Amino acid sequence: MKILGFMTGTSLDAVDMAVLETDGVEISAFGPAGERKLREATRDLLLKTTDIARAWPRGEPEPVIFEEARRAVADEHFQAAESFLDEHGLSWSDFDLLGVHGQTVLHERPTAQRVGRTVQLLDADRLARLCGRPVAFDFRTADVAVGGEGAPLAPIYHAARARASGLAAPVAALNVGGVANITLIGANGDLLAFDTGPGNGMIDLMLQARGLGRFDEDGRLALAGRVDEAVLAALLDSPYFDAPAPKSLDRYDFSLTPVDHLSAEDAAATLVAFTAEAVFKAFAQSGEAPSALIVCGGGRHNPAIMQTLAARAPVPVKSAEAYGWRGDSIEAEAFAYLAARTAKGLPISFPGTTGVPAPMTGGRIVGLISA
């Protein structure tokens, strides 16, 4: 199947797109990949929607703004893809299926008292009509409904990508987005995956709250700052890090209050160290040291994050490109791959990745897939 995958993360930066040819097990070919920045109006709407979603009481009707946001997300994806297809000389008829994550506005992990909640907004019917292609979407809901974490979902793709690269296990893939998550591929092929802690999200939120821009470009502030070890220790003193894996996070799960008194430079440096130390706590839970840590996602473009990871890591740390991976496109590729698995009824969630009782498929498809 030839599939166009889409991903928009909680950083609300861009629509990522990637073309993949796959049967849902092995990868037969990689097509072009790219991104389109979110329009400010869409970003503002989604920020507002996220704030409302976080205050949404359980058991109450969903907020009215969700429907407006669903349409906006569908339109944003369509317009992004139109320019992407034009740039690469492709047409909608080239694809068997679209795999679309949608925009996360709420993610609450399960507790002993209740199941989790997860909301990815997308008007899939609208997008399918606009594109004239079937759309696979809503990949997390079924997982959460049976008590799973709903995240991360990319691990089964990381395993396929590692096979395609000829990488010998054990190996680990780290995605640094708004939240950081890790996939540990054991020597026997078993998967253990979970959110390690914050990625770029806390740094971005800190800078935005101080009116200093949307992100720390090239890690300049963090590289100019000093880590406050007392604040770092306070940040790491969270029950989340002692909780057994698998487990998941929302980018808003940690408070910025501990860094409020620090300069922007020292706050950024301390938050970078927080991201790195949380990753190394993850290694302690794995029980099997990986031969290498492959870093994907936007965080690998931040020299402060990469330098801190490399300095503190017990294993070699390299960006995805060192292994021939497309680090900015891994998540979009993953949802193309997951779309194929959804179409074929193959599992996308596993006990070691989201905590579901048994491997299970997920996602829904609107529109008809050609035989």
Swiss-Prot record:
Catalytic activity of the protein: 1,6-anhydro-N-acetyl-beta-muramate + ATP + H2O = N-acetyl-D-muramate 6-phosphate + ADP + H(+)
Recorded GO MF terms: ATP binding; kinase activity; phosphotransferase activity, alcohol group as acceptor
Function: Catalyzes the specific phosphorylation of 1,6-anhydro-N-acetylmuramic acid (anhMurNAc) with the simultaneous cleavage of the 1,6-anhydro ring, generating MurNAc-6-P. Is required for the utilization of anhMurNAc either imported from the medium or derived from its own cell wall murein, and thus plays a role in cell wall recycling.
Involved pathway(s): Amino-sugar metabolism; 1,6-anhydro-N-acetylmuramate degradation; Cell wall biogenesis; peptidoglycan recycling
Enzyme kind, highest EC tier: transferase
InterPro entries: Anhydro_N_Ac-Mur_kinase, ATPase_NBD
Binding site residues for ATP: 9-16
Name of this chain's protein: Anhydro-N-acetylmuramic acid kinase
Keyword tRNA-binding assigned: no
Keywords associated with the record: ATP-binding, Carbohydrate metabolism, Kinase, Nucleotide-binding, Transferase
HAMAP family listed in its UniProt record: AnhMurNAc_kinase (MF_01270)
GO biological process: 1,6-anhydro-N-acetyl-beta-muramic acid catabolic process; amino sugar metabolic process; peptidoglycan turnover
EC number(s) per entry: 2.7.1.170
